[in-house]
């Protein structure tokens, strides 16, 4: 799941111009975060070049990679070039000096930089602990999700959040309120980390409208990823843009501030796990500890599964959270609700309902396997193959016919005429279907105009040559 | 319809061009044998080496946010895990550190809690490794060290393997592991061959690459080269013998030893070894072509040991067997052929 | 001069094509041209109608346990 957010933040970074990227690389925290987003071969190459004052010869890089993995090398080089970390001359590769200097600073430290956040020296009179931060993050985040699904929870998110949901296309205005869209449904099925990144990327896009410097925004986001949970940080290190961002981030539950005028803020678990793997990678020993100590709620750290799926398509979900039940209701026909569990069945109608709302079979299957009960995860196949296959078949059923708008060209005088015109259409790339036997072919709507003109020109040529 | 088949047929991607992004656990074993470091003081000082090692650890942690590290130090008296420290030790150490800030040698600045200009993950690891390593170096008895020539490489390797076993296999976290051995060769160093080789075989079974970085001027330890070769690790001799200088340790570490286990199949490993696979006598350390083999532990000897005991497994050979070995081959008397 | 007709190209498998031809036999305003076993040209405005009718015909042939249960409790 984290690879999805990687791709989208990568795309965003690759779209930035070189000057912006260089400014971005002036912060060591950002350099470190961008470094971690790179593919493995790129990271190894860069590490070897950081302490090397001379540029590296292209021949050396070629010699390093085995011939069978050439494609890997080419992809890596392309990516590094797009991010303006590498500039390639005839025979040498030079690493971006700002990036080099600041990544080195991140590794070696000592340089008085504030990009990793400045913790507060003074004691907080109203100190909060990790459990409080977790609870706060959960309640804020679930409030947003509940609002999207439509379960009434009493509170609605602030205007800033509503604005963001509208702009990102996750919800659309309808008759005085907001209604969830297809994209919104897909958003609900993602895991928490991916959801936060989707919102943050939308926020980035919006920030350009609002005249906020994207470099500041990105720096702050990457800094949040490197903060320590439970430690309060002072606002003195933040720029104006970043202080402004703090208000919005408070609404999402990513940071906690006692009140808007507070001089310190606490990052929550949502912030510290921004740049790490899916929430808490719990080991067997840690899970035992947590179970006996009865700590953190499981809805934020989405690592405890609760869904059991049987081969007869019946589903049992051990949850009480109205949010998760609402999400399940999207594609499961829920039948009974108990104190600690809901049961239902996955059938054709429920899956078709989800499919018609824009959710794909892949998303359903991924959601089920991510939230599968630990006992299911221990088996050879996490989900029963029969159910998985059937969901995919139901999706295939939905599109048994593929319809494309176009023009049918028929009634050619002779085979040569047919051949000329159809070859022309093929070269243009607008040919959808051809049947040489019947001398007919179909082209797209857009291409038909050009084909008609080609035919006219050809006929004129023939007429003039005949005369 | 095969496209929707849900039963997982583990078709291996023959091209295998996508790299799996698993985090990795690096076990660094550092030679803390003070006399050896004294020998190469002119080439590189201990504090420079430790600084290079810390930067390397930071680089490893930077590669992936779930990467972890395990640092072990060894000297003549044994091996000890320096990082991660036993829980409880860390808090007492930081308190002690704040109280007496000058307990470290070479005038190192005591790392302050206020200094948060470094990434928190790096900072904690660096501080602990630094203090523990200095403690280990300071508390060794210099005189005793010079007398003893044992080196606890096998102990250190066992500790590393045990740690890896617990954290990767028992806890079932999705990690790959590797071991880096940073050794300063000592000319009179004796190692326990069999325990060390057992550790190497265990590493081979678990597919843990063992890399060796040798700093000192001592001769190439053949068993270390064999270790790297059998586990597909990297062996590098950074000493003035090979016209390299240990002062550039950080660059060697960052370019040669930084590659993850998941990346290794795709790159050409910078290992330098012409591994000498020839057999060597356990007594005289010479290469033998024809010799004697102990029937219990299979150790090779070029001559019969004087005390009639095997040097490695200590079995006594009976007189009769040894006498039989000295015999020359019997000559069969040729029967005279009488021509008719 | 060759003729150009505006329409919608339908790609499907032969069984579905047979179903569409069947629908067309009662309502003669759907199919413009049958191209081959797996392709048809149909009238642009009839696409939705065809899809709905297809879904209905296919649903008739699928076993739905819910309906069975509903019928059982109803009766």
Curated annotation (Swiss-Prot), chain A:
Is DNA damage given among the entry's keywords?
A: yes
Molecular function in Gene Ontology: ATPase activator activity; double-stranded DNA binding; RNA polymerase II general transcription initiation factor activity
GO BP terms, alphabetized: nucleotide-excision repair; transcription initiation at RNA polymerase II promoter
Keywords (A to Z) from UniProt: DNA damage, DNA repair, Nucleus, Transcription, Transcription regulation
Record's keyword annotation contains Kinase: no
Recorded superkingdom: Eukaryota
Where's it found, cell-wise?
Answer: Nucleus
Gene Ontology CC, one term: transcription factor TFIIH core complex
Entries under InterPro entries matching the protein: Tfb2_C, TFIIH_p52/Tfb2
Q: How does it assemble?
A: Component of the 7-subunit TFIIH core complex composed of XPB/SSL2, XPD/RAD3, SSL1, TFB1, TFB2, TFB4 and TFB5, which is active in NER. The core complex associates with the 3-subunit CTD-kinase module TFIIK composed of CCL1, KIN28 and TFB3 to form the 10-subunit holoenzyme (holo-TFIIH) active in transcription.
The record's comment on protein family reads:
Belongs to the TFB2 family.
Q: What does this protein do?
A: Component of the general transcription and DNA repair factor IIH (TFIIH) core complex, which is involved in general and transcription-coupled nucleotide excision repair (NER) of damaged DNA and, when complexed to TFIIK, in RNA transcription by RNA polymerase II. In NER, TFIIH acts by opening DNA around the lesion to allow the excision of the damaged oligonucleotide and its replacement by a new DNA fragment. In transcription, TFIIH has an essential role in transcription initiation.
The protein's name is General transcription and DNA repair factor IIH subunit TFB2
* Lineage of the organism: Eukaryota, Fungi, Dikarya, Ascomycota, Saccharomycotina
Swiss-Prot record, chain B:
Gene Ontology annotations for the cellular component aspect, listed alphabetically: nucleotide-excision repair factor 3 complex; transcription factor TFIIH core complex; transcription factor TFIIH holo complex
GO annotations under biological process?
A: nucleotide-excision repair; regulation of DNA-templated transcription; transcription initiation at RNA polymerase II promoter
State any single GO MF term: zinc ion binding
Is Transmembrane helix set as a keyword in this record?
no
Q: What is its subcellular localisation?
A: Nucleus
> Taxonomically, which superkingdom?
Eukaryota
**Annotated Basic and acidic residues bias:** 92-103
Give the boundaries of each C4-type zinc finger. 294-313
| Keywords on record | DNA damage, DNA repair, Metal-binding, Nucleus, Transcription, Transcription regulation, Zinc, Zinc-finger
Predominant cellular place of this UniProt entry's protein: nucleus
Q: Where is this region: Disordered?
A: 85-117
Quaternary structure annotation from Swiss-Prot or TrEMBL? Component of the 7-subunit TFIIH core complex composed of XPB/SSL2, XPD/RAD3, SSL1, TFB1, TFB2, TFB4 and TFB5, which is active in NER. The core complex associates with the 3-subunit CTD-kinase module TFIIK composed of CCL1, KIN28 and TFB3 to form the 10-subunit holoenzyme (holo-TFIIH) active in transcription.
- Role according to the record: Component of the general transcription and DNA repair factor IIH (TFIIH) core complex, which is involved in general and transcription-coupled nucleotide excision repair (NER) of damaged DNA and, when complexed to TFIIK, in RNA transcription by RNA polymerase II. In NER, TFIIH acts by opening DNA around the lesion to allow the excision of the damaged oligonucleotide and its replacement by a new DNA fragment. In transcription, TFIIH has an essential role in transcription initiation.
Protein family: Belongs to the TFB4 family.
This chain's protein is named General transcription and DNA repair factor IIH subunit TFB4
Q: Which organism is it from?
A: Yarrowia lipolytica (strain CLIB 122 / E 150)
**What lineage does the source organism belong to?**
Eukaryota, Fungi, Dikarya, Ascomycota, Saccharomycotina
UniProtKB/Swiss-Prot annotation, chain C:
Answer whether the UniProt record assigns the keyword Nucleotide-binding to this protein: no
Quick one: a GO biological-process term for this protein? nucleotide-excision repair, preincision complex assembly
Where in or outside the cell it occurs: the entry states: Nucleus
Q: Which keywords describe this protein according to UniProt?
A: DNA damage, DNA repair, Nucleus, Transcription, Transcription regulation
**What Gene3D superfamilies does the entry give?**
TFB5-like
Query: Sorted alphabetically, which InterPro entries does this protein's record hold?
Result: TFB5-like_sf, TFIIH_TTDA/Tfb5
Record's SMART domains? Tbf5
Example GO CC term: the record gives: transcription factor TFIIH core complex
Q: What does this protein do?
A: Component of the general transcription and DNA repair factor IIH (TFIIH) core complex, which is involved in general and transcription-coupled nucleotide excision repair (NER) of damaged DNA and, when complexed to TFIIK, in RNA transcription by RNA polymerase II. In NER, TFIIH acts by opening DNA around the lesion to allow the excision of the damaged oligonucleotide and its replacement by a new DNA fragment. In transcription, TFIIH has an essential role in transcription initiation.
User: Which family is annotated?
Assistant: Belongs to the TFB5 family.
According to the record's subunit comment, the protein's assembly and interactions are:
Component of the 7-subunit TFIIH core complex composed of XPB/SSL2, XPD/RAD3, SSL1, TFB1, TFB2, TFB4 and TFB5, which is active in NER. The core complex associates with the 3-subunit CTD-kinase module TFIIK composed of CCL1, KIN28 and TFB3 to form the 10-subunit holoenzyme (holo-TFIIH) active in transcription.
Name the UniProt record assigns to this protein: General transcription and DNA repair factor IIH subunit TFB5
């Amino acid at each position: 799941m984290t690879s999805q957010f990687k791709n989208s933040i990568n795309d965003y970074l690759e779209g930035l111009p070189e000057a912006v990227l260089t400014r971005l690389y002036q912060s060591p925290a950002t350099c470190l975060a961008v470094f971690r987003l790179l593919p493995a071969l790129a990271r190894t190459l860069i590490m070897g070049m950081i302490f090397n004052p001379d540029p590296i010869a292209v021949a050396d890089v070629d010699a390093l990679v085995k011939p069978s993995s050439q494609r890997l090398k080419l992809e890596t080089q392309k990516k590094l070039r797009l991010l303006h970390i590498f500039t390639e001359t005839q025979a040498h590769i030079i690493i971006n000096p700002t990036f080099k200097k600041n990544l080195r600073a991140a590794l070696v430290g000592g340089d008085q930089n504030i990009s990793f956040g400045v913790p507060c020296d003074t004691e907080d009179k109203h100190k909060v602990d990790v459990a409080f931060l977790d609870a706060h993050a959960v309640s804020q985040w679930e409030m947003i999700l509940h609002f999207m699904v439509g379960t009434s929870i009493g509170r609605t998110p602030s205007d800033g959040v509503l604005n963001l949901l509208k702009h990102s296309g996750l919800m659309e205005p309808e008759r005085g309120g907001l209604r969830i869209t297809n994209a919104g449904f897909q958003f609900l099925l993602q895991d928490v980390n991916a959801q936060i990144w989707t919102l943050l990327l939308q926020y980035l896009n919006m920030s350009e409208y609002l005249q906020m410097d994207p470099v500041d925004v990105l720096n702050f986001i990457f800094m949040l990823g490197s903060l320590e949970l439970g430690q309060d940080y002072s606002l003195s290190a933040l720029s104006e843009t970043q202080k402004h961002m703090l208000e919005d981030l408070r609404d999402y539950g990513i940071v906690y501030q006692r009140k808007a005028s507070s001089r310190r803020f606490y990052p929550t678990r949502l912030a510290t796990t921004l740049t790490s793997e899916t929430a808490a990678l719990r080991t067997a020993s840690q899970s035992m500890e947590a179970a006996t100590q009865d700590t953190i709620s499981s809805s934020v750290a989405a690592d405890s599964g609760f869904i059991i799926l049987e081969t007869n398509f019946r589903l049992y979900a051990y949850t009480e959270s109205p949010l998760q039940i609402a999400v399940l209701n999207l594609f499961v026909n829920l039948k009974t609700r108990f104190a600690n569990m809901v049961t239902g069945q996955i059938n054709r109608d429920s899956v078709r309902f989800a499919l018609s709302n824009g959710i794909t079979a892949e998303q359903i299957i991924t959601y089920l396997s991510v939230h599968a009960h630990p006992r299911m995860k221990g088996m050879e196949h996490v989900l029963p193959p029969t159910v998985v296959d059937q969901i995919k078949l139901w999706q295939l059923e939905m599109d048994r016919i593929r319809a494309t708008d176009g023009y049918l060209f028929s009634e050619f005088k002779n085979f040569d005429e047919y051949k000329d015109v159809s070859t022309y259409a093929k070269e243009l790339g607008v040919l959808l279907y051809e049947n040489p036997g019947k001398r007919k072919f179909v082209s797209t709507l857009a291409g038909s105009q050009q084909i008609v003109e080609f035919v006219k020109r050809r006929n004129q040529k023939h007429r003039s040559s005949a005369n | 319809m095969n496209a929707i088949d849900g039963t997982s047929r583990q078709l291996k991607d023959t091209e295998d061009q996508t790299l799996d992004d698993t985090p990795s656990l690096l076990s660094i074993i550092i030679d803390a044998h003070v006399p050896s470091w004294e020998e190469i003081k002119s080439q590189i000082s201990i504090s420079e080496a430790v600084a290079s090692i810390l930067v390397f650890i930071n680089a490893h942690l930077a590669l992936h946010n779930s990467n972890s590290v395990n640092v072990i130090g060894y000297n003549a008296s044994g091996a000890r895990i320096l990082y991660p420290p036993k829980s409880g030790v860390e808090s007492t150490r930081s308190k002690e550190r704040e109280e007496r800030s000058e307990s470290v040698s070479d005038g190192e600045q005591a790392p302050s809690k206020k200094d948060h200009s470094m990434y928190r993950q790096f900072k904690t690891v660096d501080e602990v490794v630094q203090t523990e390593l200095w403690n280990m170096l300071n508390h060794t008895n210099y005189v005793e060290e010079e007398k003893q020539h044992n080196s606890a490489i096998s102990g250190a390797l066992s500790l590393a393997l045990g740690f890896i076993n617990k954290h990767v296999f028992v806890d079932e976290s999705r990690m790959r592991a590797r071991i880096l051995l940073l050794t300063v060769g000592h000319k009179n160093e004796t190692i326990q061959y069999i325990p060390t080789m057992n550790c190497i075989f265990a590493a081979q079974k678990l597919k843990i690459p063992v890399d060796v970085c040798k700093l000192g001027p001592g001769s190439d330890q053949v068993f270390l080269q064999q270790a790297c070769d059998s586990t597909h690790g990297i062996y590098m001799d950074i000493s003035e013998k090979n016209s390299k200088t240990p002062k550039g340790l950080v660059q060697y570490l960052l370019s040669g030893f930084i590659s993850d286990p998941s990346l290794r199949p795709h790159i050409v490993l910078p290992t330098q070894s012409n591994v000498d696979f020839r057999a060597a006598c356990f007594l005289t350390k010479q290469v033998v072509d024809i010799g004697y083999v102990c029937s219990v532990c299979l150790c090779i000897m070029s001559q019969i040991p004087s005390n009639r005991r095997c040097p490695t497994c200590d079995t006594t050979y009976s007189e009769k067997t040894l006498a039989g070995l000295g015999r020359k081959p019997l000559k069969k008397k040729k029967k005279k052929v009488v021509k008719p | 001069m060759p003729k150009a007709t505006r329409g919608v190209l339908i790609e499907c498998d032969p069984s579905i094509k047979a179903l569409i031809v069947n629908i067309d036999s009662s309502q003669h305003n759907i199919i413009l041209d049958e191209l081959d076993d797996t392709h048809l040209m149909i009238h642009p405005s009839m696409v939705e109608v065809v899809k709905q009718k297809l879904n209905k015909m296919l649903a008739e042939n699928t076993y739905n346990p819910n309906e069975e249960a509903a019928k059982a409790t109803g009766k």
